[in-house]
Curated annotation (Swiss-Prot):
Source lineage: Eukaryota, Viridiplantae, Streptophyta, Embryophyta, Tracheophyta
Protein kinase domain: residues covered: 58-324
Organism: Arabidopsis thaliana
The reaction(s) this protein catalyses: L-seryl-[protein] + ATP = O-phospho-L-seryl-[protein] + ADP + H(+); L-threonyl-[protein] + ATP = O-phospho-L-threonyl-[protein] + ADP + H(+)
GO BP annotations listed: brassinosteroid mediated signaling pathway
InterPro entries cross-referenced by the UniProt entry: BSK, Kinase-like_dom_sf, Prot_kinase_dom, Ser-Thr/Tyr_kinase_cat_dom, TPR-like_helical_dom_sf
Localisation per UniProt entry: Cell membrane
The protein's name in its UniProt record: Serine/threonine-protein kinase BSK3
Length: 489
């Protein structure tokens, strides 16, 4: 693997060598169907609002934030399962029956190479899709905007193979069309394995657009007819091969000119110097050239892509998170005193820590009262909070619950009050009410670690150990992020 890119030559024939990839659940380069993903279901709008804190801006993960035409949010269901929620613009799918039929069809797919579609919501004008949440960003992020290290050649080859396997799986299930395949559609799961977003299997039915990217990257037949074909997907796959080879988003026409002129030094990412052999580089360039053929019928099919990419794989025994230089999802982060107390369900220690924290985490999220808003009712609510704080310190939990309830019922907002009442409920052997308050605290302050820790303690006492551990890790991640420490994925 010592050759550099400057000596690559552009060949004409594609090798069809066979090899067995040693990565988990891969046999002869084919993607396997999985059965441990929940069946597709319909969610209520209220469930998805609760999961995303009312579609809060802080929960947006789509490329262009809230300005994106169809915004994607991260969320967390009641059972602590993380989800991605795609919210289409109003009336993007005017025919609710068509939306449901299409979503149910895509929702039957289950592959380890995809961020599987878990469900949808179709209430009134709302059209939402729910998929598995992938916590480790997009290919675009790791390829074009990397922070610690550029993506290694070995990992780039794994990405294109897994992507080809995902497309081949879809093809085998009769889903041959994928809309606007690009580096933002490739996501990384908890183990840092690449997965294809299922959102791209459904397009916006009203505008009918299959490509939102620059026209320079659009398949030529789509420009002529406005229709997407299975061969159009292969063309887009070719543009992704160029992305991975160059580390940049190069227009296909320019890349093909460089290939024809054998100017591959300019085409290839300088970060890859010395990481691959001339023959491997030539093979990838040849495959990209075939995918980008002007005539659609001259492009390879998905099965040919898998066959060509499988023998190029290297270091198949090395896990993806190691190649990516990212922490493993099972890594254990040292817990803070509060996290440790919540993990042990040590309510006395939790009480001492919450009392010391005071209300400093309420800054910026509590009610800001103007002079004109100081009414007798407001003053009464604030007095109730003060009485609740006194009762909290004196461990009079029934009195504290009553006073904090008066404060909340008065329309006042405070995540700390919700957290304190949550702990009072735990002290009073009322874990369900405690969980509700902890969730409400997170609705008010979505990135507050204390709320996650209290959810963990409540879930544990309710006997939901798996969900408790998920919430505990989430709290640890949020606390580490707040303190500027690299978080555990």
């Amino acid at each position: 693997m010592g050759g550099q890119c400057s000596s690559l030559s552009c060949c004409r024939n594609t090798s069809h060598k066979t090899a067995v990839l040693e990565a988990p659940d891969v046999d002869n380069g084919e993607s396997s169907e999985i059965t441990d993903v929940p069946n597709f279901r319909e969610y209520t709008l209220e469930q998805l609002k609760a999961a995303t804190s009312g579609f809060a801006v802080e929960y947006i993960v789509s490329e262009h934030g809230e300005k994106a035409p169809n915004v994607v949010y991260k969320g967390k269901l009641e059972n602590q399962k993380k989800i991605a929620v795609k919210r289409f613009t109003r009336m993007a799918w005017p025919d609710s029956r068509q939306f449901l039929e299409e979503a149910r069809s895509v929702g039957q797919l289950r592959s380890e190479r995809m961020a599987n579609l878990l469900g949808c919501c179709c209430e009134g004008d709302e059209r939402l899709l729910v998929a598995e949440f992938m916590p480790n960003e997009t290919l675009a992020k790791h390829l074009f905007h990397w922070e610690t290290q550029p993506m290694k050649w070995t990992m780039r080859l794994r990405v294109v193979l897994y992507l080809a396997q995902a497309l081949e799986y879809c093809t085998s299930k009769g889903r041959t069309l994928y809309h606007d395949l690009n580096a933002y559609r490739v996501l990384f799961d908890e183990e840092c394995n690449p997965r294809l977003s299922t959102f791209g299997l459904m397009k916006n039915s009203r505008d009918g657009k299959s490509y939102s990217t620059n026209l320079a990257f659009t398949p030529p037949e789509y420009l002529r007819t406005g229709r997407i074909t299975p061969e159009s997907v292969i063309y887009s796959f070719g543009t992704l091969l160029l992305d991975l080879l160059s580390g940049k988003h190069i227009p296909p026409s320019h890349a093909l000119d460089l290939i024809r002129d054998r100017n591959l030094q300019t085409l290839t990412d300088s970060c890859l110097d010395g990481q691959f052999s001339d023959s491997d580089g030539t093979e990838l360039v040849r495959l990209a050239s075939r995918c980008l053929q002007y005539e659609a019928r001259e492009r390879p099919n998905t099965k040919s892509l898998v066959t060509a990419l499988t023998p190029l794989q290297k270091e198949t025994e090395v896990l993806s998170h190691v190649l990516m230089g990212l922490p493993h999802s099972g890594s254990v982060s040292p817990l803070s005193p509060l996290g440790e107390a919540c993990s042990r369900r040590d309510l006395t220690a939790m009480l001492e820590i919450l009392e010391k924290l005071g209300y400093k985490d309420d800054e910026g999220v509590t009610n800001e009262l103007s002079f004109h808003m100081w009414t007798d009712q407001m003053q009464e609510s604030l007095n109730s909070k003060k009485k609740g704080d006194v009762a909290f310190r004196q461990k009079d939990f029934r009195e504290a619950i009553e006073c904090y309830t008066q404060f909340i019922d008065g329309g006042m907002i405070s995540p700390t009050v919700c957290a304190r009442r949550s702990l009072c409920y735990l002290m009073s052997d009322m874990p369900k009410e405690a969980l509700d308050d902890a969730i409400q605290a997170q609705v008010i302050s979505p990135v507050w670690h204390v709320a996650s820790y209290l959810q963990s303690a409540s879930l544990g006492i309710l006997g939901m150990e798996k969900e408790s551990q998920i919430a505990l890790k989430e709290g640890s991640n949020l606390e580490a992020k707040m303190n500027g420490v690299p978080r555990v994925k």
